[in-house]
From Swiss-Prot:
GO terms for cellular component: axonemal A tubule inner sheath; axonemal microtubule; sperm flagellum. This is EF-hand domain-containing family member B. It comes from Mus musculus (Mouse). GO terms for biological process: flagellated sperm motility; negative regulation of protein binding; regulation of calcineurin-NFAT signaling cascade; regulation of store-operated calcium entry. Microtubule inner protein component of sperm flagellar doublet microtubules. Interacts with STIM1 and ORAI1; the interactions take place upon Ca(2+)-store depletion and dissociate through a Ca(2+)-dependent mechanism. Interaction with STIM1 inhibits STIM1 interaction with SARAF. One of its GO terms (molecular function) is calcium ion binding. It comes from the Eukaryota. Its main location: cytoplasm. Residues 1-31, 244-266 are annotated as: Disordered. It is found in: Cytoplasm, Cytoskeleton, Cilium axoneme; Cytoplasm, Cytoskeleton, Flagellum axoneme; Cytoplasm.
Length: 853
């Protein structure tokens, strides 16, 4: 018994599912090999080929049966009487192990999908069609072979039910089916016009097949094709493994535009163009998505997207519309106050310019009245606009104005054109010009251009075409022309001496500036030597401004001693460099100078040290150097003076053992022996402890203190002139002085409520450099000056104090609020006023506590 299924109208070729099954790990799983009468070696070969992904077991079994049939036909020896492809296919299908039940023989539903993916005549399968493929199952697009009973996909509910039942097929039923049906799912066409078509009927309600777009162009079906009876084919349900993973249904994208394929829809590169001869091999080239086209990109989508108002202000600030004002996005939503403000006096609106340039059209009656009013004017009568005036009032009555011509008619004999350019040939004009020329040469001396004058010489002795005289000199370089372009006196002036007027020369010498010299207009009137100085010479004082400021004595004046000071500074620098390069410590350097070892340096020792340092000084310069270093004026240079004036003490550190150096007193002079100085002097330290100071504040390194000369100290008794100005009790303070110019902080004008972007004035509400370098805690938290001085209500002030941790009772808060409201004339209170009141109350409590203690 067979059941039938209804197939939809013919459609273009669509895709089908792959015969290979996938495991749960998305790997290819080799299905069970049906019993096809194969040897164990052939079964192993089939299983290996399935695992390599070349062909499915069904395809391999089908091909093997075809090979066996081919060998059987060869053994039969009848090469001419070959079976048709459909018969060969049927023979190959006879021995398949077909799963099913006898009661459900006709329920030929298969996997998900349409019945035939578009109806075809029986015997013609989707795939490659050609004479070389007769009798062979067609191939799939993505590799593998398509078999009608095994790879065709069904979406019938009967198929789903059949998959849930345990199916068992028998060979007896298969033989019966094969006897009745030579080919499953195919049509035998020996005679197309005579053979009937074997179809399968569907006893269940018709369900429209789900169309799958493969990217090929769809042909428009006619009404006749739509109304025709759908074709029906005989199909068979394949054996299915109960553990095989079902193919997932593809979800159609929900947001695709009509007529536009989604970008993820990728077609095979050979679709509709070529036959894939080797489907198991990967295709060469790049598979491009066939989604959005150029036409889709160039098609404008309507309605256009609107920019939200929140982002529109930023766009209008950067790209304002034509003729619109560029408004900063920070004040784009501010209330428009400026357009409604009126500055000055409002002027009365006069006649607008538009009505004057383009007045409104008037009616015919108004035009008549206007012409009547203007007709009385003489200018309107004698010179009307756009036409000549009416001369009828000045002419006789009854005169035909149009046909009457006034004046004497002009007789036109020859036009100007004929006079200037007569209509004659060149020969006629030349002939007329030659007539009477001989007479004109005698009477008027009228010769043609270049014509020689006939002087009527004797032709026997003189011929007018002969040349007489010396040939004119000629040069091709143009020297003669250059000479002719200059006047004769100019050439003579160039050759002669340059004569300049005495008056002009005196004027230039007196008033013309000379390079590198000062202009002296009266230099010629001064009969004095060049180095003469006019006026009385001022002799400089012995002291200068520095001597007065430092309160120096007359013997210490520095005026006129520049050379002496420079020589002393050079000698000191030479000794400092010598000590720094040759000695490691100040003690070793001082010991080199102190030859006697008494802890001081005298003049002889300093002179000897200078000679050893290759510094030769005369007696005067040596005395100046010694006097400069001897600050206490005792005639000796001690260790502290030596370190300050003859060494770089900051470069040579002070060692620890140098602090404990002891110097023995020198022996007394035998000639001046007194009773009080009989014994030797007591030993003393080389460096006094009070002369040792830290090198830097807080540093562990120590050095000798810096001593100053008496002349370097500044007197505390002098006063500058600037300190004496306005140093009068009761004088006018400087704040009352008149101020000129524009102040930096514009406190003279009130700050605008809404400031423009171009307003760069400082109204006192901006921070200074100190606030930028040292921001307060309020600035770091984002609280600014306007937040402190903003007027707030009592509840808001109470919430602010509570949030910052200031706990006040109701009576205390009322007291603080009353004190703060009294500080403003309107009773307004801000955070700054509350802070000041709290500080005043806290200060008053501290004063009370100190008084009580």
């Amino acid at each position: 018994m067979c059941s039938f299924v209804r197939v939809g109208s013919p459609k273009p070729l669509q895709t089908s599912a792959s015969p290979l099954e996938m495991s749960s790990l998305r790997r290819t799983r080799a299905p069970e090999i049906s019993e096809l009468g194969l040897t164990p070696e052939q079964k192993d070969d089939i299983r290996d080929r399935v695992l390599r992904g070349s062909k499915s077991p069904t395809e391999l079994g089908f091909d093997l049966r075809l090979e066996q049939d081919r060998k059987w036909r060869e053994r039969m020896g009848s090469s001419e009487a070959k079976s048709p492809p459909c018969h060969a296919l049927g023979v190959g299908l006879e021995r398949h192990t077909i799963s099913g039940t006898p009661t459900e023989m006709g329920n030929l539903g298969l996997h998900k999908g349409s019945a035939f993916q578009g109806s075809k005549p029986l015997g013609v399968l989707p795939g490659r069609v050609g004479p070389e493929n007769k009798g062979l199952p067609p191939r799939l697009r993505y590799g593998g072979t398509l078999h009608p009973p095994f790879s065709t996909v069904h979406a019938s509910p009967l198929a789903a039910e059949s998959r849930r039942r345990p199916l068992a097929w028998g060979s007896a039923w298969t033989d019966a089916v094969v006897e009745k049906q030579p080919v499953v799912g195919l049509e035998l066409r020996k005679e197309p016009e005579k053979e009937p078509t074997c179809v399968v009927m569907n006893p269940y309600p018709e369900m429209p097949p789900k169309e799958v777009d493969i990217g090929l162009p769809q042909t428009q079906e006619s009404d006749e094709a739509k109304n025709t009876e759908p074709l029906i084919g005989l199909v068979r349900e394949p054996s299915e493994c109960p553990f095989a993973q079902q193919p997932e249904e593809k979800k159609e994208p929900g947001s695709t535009e009509p007529g536009v394929e989604p970008p993820g829809n990728i077609r095979p590169i050979y679709s509709g163009k070529f036959f894939d001869r080797v489907p198991c091999w990967p295709s060469a080239g790049k598979v491009k998505p066939v989604g959005y086209r150029v036409a889709t990109c160039l098609t404008e989508k309507l309605p256009r997207l609107m920019t939200p108002p929140e982002a529109k202000k930023y766009f209008n600030f950067r790209y304002p519309p034509a003729g619109a004002e560029r408004v900063f996005y920070g004040r784009a939503n501010d209330p428009q106050i400026a357009p409604y403000l009126t500055h000055g006096l409002r002027s009365k609106i006069s006649i607008p310019m538009g009505s004057l340039i383009n007045p409104q059209p008037i009616t015919t009656f108004q035009q008549k009245i206007k012409d009547k009013k203007e007709s009385i004017y003489f200018s309107h009568q004698r010179a009307p606009l756009g036409k000549s005036h009416d001369q009828t009032p000045g002419l006789p009555k009854g005169m035909d104005v149009i046909n009457t011509t006034l004046g004497t008619p002009t007789i036109r004999e020859l036009s100007v054109r004929d006079t200037v350019n007569p209509s004659k040939s060149f020969e006629d004009v030349l002939k007329e010009g030659q007539e009477g020329h001989d007479l004109y040469t005698v009477s008027h001396n009228d010769y043609f251009a270049g014509e020689a004058k006939n002087r009527k010489y004797n032709p026997a002795s003189f011929h007018r075409f002969n040349l007489y005289g010396i040939p004119t000199p000629h040069f091709n370089d143009g020297r003669t022309m250059a000479k002719a372009l200059h006047w004769l006196h100019e050439l003579q002036m160039e050759r002669g001496a340059k004569i300049v007027s005495k008056r002009v020369d005196d004027f230039k010498e007196k008033f013309q500036h000379k390079l590198g010299k000062v202009l002296d207009p009266i230099a010629e009137t001064m009969n004095v030597p060049p180095g003469h100085t006019f006026g009385s010479c001022l002799h400089p004082e012995e002291y200068g401004a520095g001597d007065l400021i430092h309160y120096r004595s007359p013997d210490e004046y520095l005026r006129g001693k520049d050379h002496q000071r420079a020589v002393v500074a050079a000698a000191r620098h030479h000794l400092k460099k010598f000590n720094h390069q040759n000695f490691d410590t100040l003690q070793v350097a001082f010991r080199h100078y102190d030859k006697k070892g008494d802890g001081v340096i005298d003049r002889a020792e300093l002179h000897e040290a200078c000679v050893q340092a290759n510094l030769h000084l005369d007696k005067m310069l040596l005395d100046h150097l010694f006097d400069y270093c001897d600050v206490d004026q005792d005639g000796l240079i001690n260790y502290l003076e030596f370190a300050n004036f003859l060494n770089w003490k900051d470069r040579i550190p002070l060692k620890e053992h140098e602090k404990r150096v002891v110097v023995k007193g020198k022996k007394p002079d035998c000639e001046n022996v007194t009773d009080t100085s009989m014994g030797e002097a007591e030993p003393s330290l080389l460096i006094n402890p009070e002369d040792i100071v830290p090198k830097e504040p807080g540093s562990s390194e120590e050095t000798l203190r810096t001593i100053q000369r008496p002349g370097d100290k500044v007197s505390h008794q002098y006063k500058t002139t600037s300190s004496e100005i306005n140093a009068v009790v009761g004088a006018v303070p400087s704040m009352c002085h008149p101020i000129f110019g524009v102040p930096t902080i514009r406190s003279d004008i009130s700050a605008p409520r809404i400031r423009r972007v171009s307003d760069m004035n400082n109204y006192g509400d901006e921070g200074n450099a100190y606030s930028l370098l040292h921001p307060s805690i309020f600035s770091q938290k984002g609280v600014f000056e306007r937040d402190f001085f903003k007027t707030r209500s009592k509840e808001e002030i109470s919430d602010i104090l509570t949030n910052i941790g200031v706990k006040l009772s109701k009576e205390e808060f009322e007291n603080v609020w009353n004190l703060a409201s009294k500080k403003h004339q309107r009773g307004e209170v801000c955070v700054e006023t509350i802070r000041n009141v709290l500080d005043e109350l806290l200060h008053a409590d501290l004063v009370k506590c100190k008084t009580a203690m």
